[in-house]
C-alpha cells in the first residue's frame, strides 16, 4: 500500500544489549509516520527513541507526504502520526479521516504559519502582505514568494493568500522545505530581498534574523495546535505506547531550540540532549512521576 514510503527501523544494525530494555518479541513494531519537515522530524524521532529505550518496543518510522500520512493512519497501515496541524492548516485532510482516527493529544501549542522577510528589509517598505503590491517592492522581490512542497497546508493557504490579496504578477514558487531554505540562505548571504512561506516552530529563526509580516486578512490562519493522531483501535491494542504519546507535550520554545541544535549537530544528538536536559518532563510522559 505504501509503495513510495521510506521505512526506517531505528533498531536496524544495533547489537543486542544497546538499549536498557530488550524489545518485546511478541509485539509488532510501532509504525509512526512523518513528513520531511524539521519540527515533525524532531518530535517523531524523540518519541521513537523513548519508545525503544524506555518501553522496549521496536519502532518503524515511515516518511511520506502529508496526504498519505492521514490515509495511512485511517486505514491502519500506520499506528500514529505526530504532526496534525489543526484546526486550519490540515483541515481538509482531517475532515476526510476524522471518523477513522483517534486524537491522542496535543504535542505542542502555539504553532503558526506566515510569510517572512529578512530583518534588513525596512519595515516601512514591507510590514504587511498588502505592501507586496507596491511596484518597487514587487520589483525587488522579482514577483516571487518562496514556497515549500505542493502537498503542504501552508502551500494551499499561501496560494489562497496570493488571490485574496490580489498579488497580480506574483508566483508562489513550489519547492520543498529544503529548497526554500537554500533560497533563503543564498539570498541572505547576498542581502537580497525575498519573502518566504514559513512556520513556527522552525530552526530558521535561530539561524537567521527574520520577521513575520502582517496578514490583516487572516489568510494564513491563527495560532494552531499540533496533535498526535492514531488508528482507531490503537489505544486498545497498545495502551502503553498510546498512553505515552497522549502525554508527550513540548513547550514550543524548547522545541524550537532543540530543532536548532539538530541543525547544528544532528537529530540524534539533539534528541539525546533534550532527554538529558528534561528528565522530569520525560518521566511524566512515561507515566513515571512517582518513580
What residue ranges belong to the model's regions?
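An extracytoplasmic/periplasmic, membrane-proximal ligand-sensing/linker region
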Residues: 41, 154-189, 223-225, 240, ...
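A ligand-binding cleft/hinge motif common to bilobed small-molecule-binding domains
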Residues: 82-97, 186-211
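Short, well-ordered beta-strand elements
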Residues: 25-39, 57-62, 142-146, 245
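A bilobed periplasmic-binding-protein/Venus flytrap-type ligand-binding module shared by bacterial periplasmic
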Residues: 113-123, 224-237
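Ligand-binding cleft/hinge of the Venus flytrap
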Residues: 47-56, 131, 136-171
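Immediate post-signal peptide segment of exported/extracytoplasmic ligand-binding proteins
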Residues: 22-32, 134-142, 281-291
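Short helix-initiation/N-cap motifs at beta->coil->alpha
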Residues: 37-38, 58-72, 172-183
